[in-house]
């Protein structure tokens, strides 16, 4: 326990909270341009080809972003919106692309959980 004199000389340090999504700079989403669209394999117990794109954001950052849902229409130079949210089994992927906004189409034939995949209500 510190004495009062010690605390007067050097107050207690506040714990600084570090952001999980620094590239967003406290914004809910950011716009960017795809520089590369590719697939990658997940970490050890899992096996798949995960769809990922490299995005150059409007603030100059370049980040990897996961493309959720079945099938996508993204290619190089597509303009996308990204949000925070990491993919646990892909190291270095800390962002998600928002489906159904800008150049990213919604997931086709999606019936449930549509709002997360930018799909309109079926007639």
From Swiss-Prot:
User: Sites of the modification 3-methylthioaspartic acid?
Assistant: 89
Please tell me the species this chain comes from. Answer: Ectopseudomonas mendocina (strain ymp) (Pseudomonas mendocina)
| An example molecular function term from Gene Ontology annotations | rRNA binding
Subunit structure of this chain's protein: Part of the 30S ribosomal subunit. Contacts proteins S8 and S17. May interact with IF1 in the 30S initiation complex.
What's a GO biological-process term for it? Answer: translation
Biased composition regions of type Basic residues, renumbered to the chain: 113-123
PANTHER family tied to this protein: 30S RIBOSOMAL PROTEIN S12 FAMILY MEMBER
- Per its UniProt record, what PROSITE patterns does this chain match? RIBOSOMAL_S12
Task: Name the encoding gene, please.
Answer: rpsL
Protein name per the record: Small ribosomal subunit protein uS12
For the keyword Methyltransferase, the answer is no
């Amino acid at each position: 326990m510190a004495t009062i004199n010690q605390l007067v000389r050097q107050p207690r340090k506040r714990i600084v909270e570090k952001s999980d999504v620094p590239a967003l700079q406290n914004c809910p989403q950011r716009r960017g341009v795809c520089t590369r669209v590719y697939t990658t394999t997940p970490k050890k117990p899992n096996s798949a080809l995960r769809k990922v794109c490299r995005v150059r954001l409007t603030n100059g950052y370049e980040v990897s972003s996961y493309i959720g849902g079945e099938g996508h229409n993204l290619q190089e130079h597509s303009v996308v919106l990204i949000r925070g949210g990491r993919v646990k089994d892909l190291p270095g992927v800390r962002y998600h692309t928002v489906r159904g906004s800008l150049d990213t189409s919604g997931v086709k034939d999606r019936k449930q959980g549509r709002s997360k995949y930018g799909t309109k209500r079926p007639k």
